[in-house]
């Protein structure tokens, strides 16, 4: 009996212990689950926080990227605006450098010095030039510095200074014989907005200058008309679309400017009109007491010198070869009286008589003859009477022709023929004698260029040349101090050889 009770008690105890142990395990599991859930929630919270931070960081990065792009765009805009402003500034203001130069060496057929120059004949004293090709031994340089600007209101300004020098010495150091000189220094004011009507678009100027509308025959080194000095004026007063006028006042000095007592000045008033291709120019001048002018020793210079003068020019500027074919041509007829009888250099000769009269005719043209041949004929003729002495007469005419034969794009053969006839009767003025006769010159010049071979106005050029010239024997007797008839340079034929460069830009 006892054994059965004991067994029952043991079974009951074991059963209770197992139940208690089971309850304990469930509680632990539940606690662990709660803790795990809590940790999961905390992890989710941390993940959400990290995600929020990541999104915030991404937004900041995006904002920074956007701002950086904006900054780059702004920088690019600034760069572009700056470039535009700099370009605009460059277009509105700037310096320019231009120039002309020629330099060469010449000798005769004995390898000795010889005479040369476009004005070497007796007619040259009154402007009778001959062909210059193979006939110049000087070094002449012009250097032009300009500053131009355009203001915001559309007005323009221009300052120009020209320095020039002429030299016949072949040495590299020639300061002691230099003719270095400031030939131009002037200012122009253009397109002034306050100007209206005919003056709209005109240009005011003042200073020392060559007149803008001078023109020349380059191949004989002669201006057709040359107005220069110190003064002021206005260009391009437009009356309508085809008519414009220039008005100017120039001053010049006569005599030795080193003489402080020399106060004779020539004042030139000029009106230059352009009607389409036609030019009509009229000038008047006055030099008070020119007939009483004295030299540095106090002696009268010329008691019959003129005090006043007039000058006129009628010109035609064509963009064809005399209306016949392609090319260019210019023609002019000039007349001068008194001080105006120096018709080329207006107002530059103070020795002219009050009764002096001069007529001049000038014409030249350029045209291609074929693909490889080009021609430039020119004529210059003048008749002047009562010029320096009563009853005197200076008549001459020059015919010149230059041909270019293109060999290739960098090499050409140039040919020039020049003929001049003169009949000079100076009536003893300046110990000159009456002569008449002819002068001839032929030149052959192989020429190197970088391009535009057939363009007569394209430079630079380097030339080799040989020239032959001859003249009537009577011309040797014109004067004792001129070229023709001088020692070793008399009629009968003269050869010369040399080389020369010429450039302009």
Per-region residue spans from a language model:
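Gram-negative bacterial Sec-dependent N-terminal signal peptides
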Residues: 1-24, 40
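C-terminal structured domain segments
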Residues: 434-486
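Surface-exposed coil loops of outer-membrane beta-barrel proteins
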Residues: 110-133, 171-183, 194-304, 482-487
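Residue-level recognition of the N-termini of beta-strands and the immediately preceding loop/turn
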Residues: 157-159, 201-202, 245, 327-329, ...
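Beta-barrel outer-membrane channel/assembly domains of diderm bacteria
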Residues: 23-196, 204, 237-240, 272, ...
């Amino acid at each position: 009996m006892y054994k059965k009770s004991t067994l029952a008690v043991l079974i009951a105890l074991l059963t209770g212990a197992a139940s208690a142990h089971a309850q304990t395990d469930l509680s632990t599991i539940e606690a662990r689950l709660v803790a795990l859930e809590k940790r999961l929630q905390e992890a989710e919270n941390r993940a959400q926080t990290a995600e929020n931070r990541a999104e915030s960081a991404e937004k900041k990065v995006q904002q920074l990227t956007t701002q950086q792009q904006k900054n780059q765009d702004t920088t690019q805009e600034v760069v572009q605006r700056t470039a535009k402003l700099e370009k605009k500034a460059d277009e509105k203001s700037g310096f320019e450098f231009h120039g002309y130069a020629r330099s060469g060496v010449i000798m005769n057929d004995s390898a000795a010095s010889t005479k040369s120059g476009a004005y070497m004949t007796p007619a040259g004293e009154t402007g009778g030039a001959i062909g210059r090709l193979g006939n110049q031994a000087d070094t002449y340089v012009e250097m032009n510095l300009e500053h131009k600007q355009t203001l915001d209101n559309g007005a323009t300004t221009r300052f120009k200074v020209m320095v020039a020098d002429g030299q016949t010495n072949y040495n590299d150091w020639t300061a002691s014989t230099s003719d270095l000189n400031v030939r131009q220094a002037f200012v122009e004011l253009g397109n002034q907005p306050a100007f209206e009507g005919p003056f709209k678009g005109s240009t005011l100027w003042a200073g020392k200058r060559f007149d803008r509308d001078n023109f020349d025959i380059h191949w004989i080194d002669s201006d057709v008309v040359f107005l220069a000095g110190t003064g002021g004026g206005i260009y391009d007063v437009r009356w309508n679309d085809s008519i414009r006028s220039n008005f100017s006042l120039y001053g010049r000095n006569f005599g030795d400017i080193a003489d402080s007592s020399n106060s004779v000045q020539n004042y030139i008033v000029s009106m230059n009109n352009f009607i389409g291709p036609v030019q009509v120019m009229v000038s008047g001048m006055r030099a008070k007491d020119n007939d009483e002018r004295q030299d540095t020793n106090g002696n009268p210079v010329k008691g019959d010198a003129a005090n006043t003068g007039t000058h006129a020019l009628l010109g035609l500027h064509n963009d064809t070869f005399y209306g016949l074919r392609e090319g260019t041509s210019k023609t002019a007829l000039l007349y001068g009286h008194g001080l105006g009888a120096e018709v080329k250099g207006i107002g530059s000769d103070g020795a002219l008589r009050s009764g002096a009269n001069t007529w001049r005719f000038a014409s030249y043209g350029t045209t291609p003859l074929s693909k490889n041949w080009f021609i430039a004929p020119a004529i210059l003729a003048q008749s002047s009477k009562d010029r320096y002495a009563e009853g005197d007469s200076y008549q001459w005419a020059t015919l010149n022709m230059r041909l270019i034969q293109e060999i290739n794009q960098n090499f050409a053969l140039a040919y020039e023929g020049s003929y001049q006839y003169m009949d000079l009767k100076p009536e003893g003025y300046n110990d000159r004698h009456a002569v008449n006769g002819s002068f001839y010159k032929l030149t052959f010049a192989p020429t190197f260029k970088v391009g535009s071979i057939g363009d007569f106005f394209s430079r630079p050029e380097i030339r080799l040349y040989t020239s032959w010239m001859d003249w009537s024997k009577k011309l040797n007797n014109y004067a004792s101090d001129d070229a023709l008839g001088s020692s070793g340079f008399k009629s009968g034929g003269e050869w010369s050889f040399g080389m020369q460069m010429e450039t302009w830009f």
